[in-house]
């Protein structure tokens, strides 16, 4: 999943890829039913409404939760009651990210706060920075794999276009 109200990040690209694979694994994409892309994504695979009873049931029994945003309030459907369910939740939390880490955000993404099973990074520098700062993950948790949405890019050589991509960042 991505954020509940978004359907354009690494979670969606991985979902599109995974439903094309012939694996006997149940795959669901969690999304707010009011999202403008909800019906389109249902054509791709199984979409579960965010905060629905089925989302809560799947949250308790999921073996893996794969997301581009690992906040407990996003991945676990027990808003406000998370402390009561924390011991019951046994899923592997796989963090795809939604970009490349530039700054040290270990205060938020450290093992004590998130306890991720896998933490995907996109570059050697990013990989090294995780161990230089205080994220406190073991080496096997941090995986240099890239971002699913970049795997979906296509090389179009015959176009002569310039893309300008402003950023909110101040560097």
Task: Name the predicted role of every residue range.
Residues 156-171:
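Conserved donor-binding/catalytic core segment of Leloir-type glycosyltransferases
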Residues 1-153:
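Active-site and donor-binding regions of nucleotide-sugar-utilizing enzymes
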């Amino acid at each position: 999943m991505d954020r509940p109200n978004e359907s354009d990040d690494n979670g969606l690209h991985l979902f599109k890829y995974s439903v094309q694979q012939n694996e006997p694994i149940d795959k669901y994409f969690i999304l707010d039913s009011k999202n403008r892309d909800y019906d389109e994504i249902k054509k791709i695979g199984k979409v579960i409404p965010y905060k629905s009873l089925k989302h809560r049931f799947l949250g308790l029994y999921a073996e893996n939760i794969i997301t581009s945003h690992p906040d407990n309030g996003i991945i676990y459907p027990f808003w406000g009651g998370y402390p009561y369910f924390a011991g019951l939740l046994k899923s592997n939390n796989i963090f795809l990210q939604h970009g490349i880490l530039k700054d040290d955000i270990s205060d938020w993404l450290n093992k004590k706060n998130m306890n991720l099973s896998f933490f995907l990074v996109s570059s050697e520098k990013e990989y090294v920075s995780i161990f230089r700062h205080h994220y406190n993950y073991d080496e096997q948790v941090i995986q240099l794999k890239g971002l699913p949405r970049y795997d979906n890019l296509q090389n179009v050589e015959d176009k002569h276009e310039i893309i300008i991509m402003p950023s909110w960042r101040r560097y």
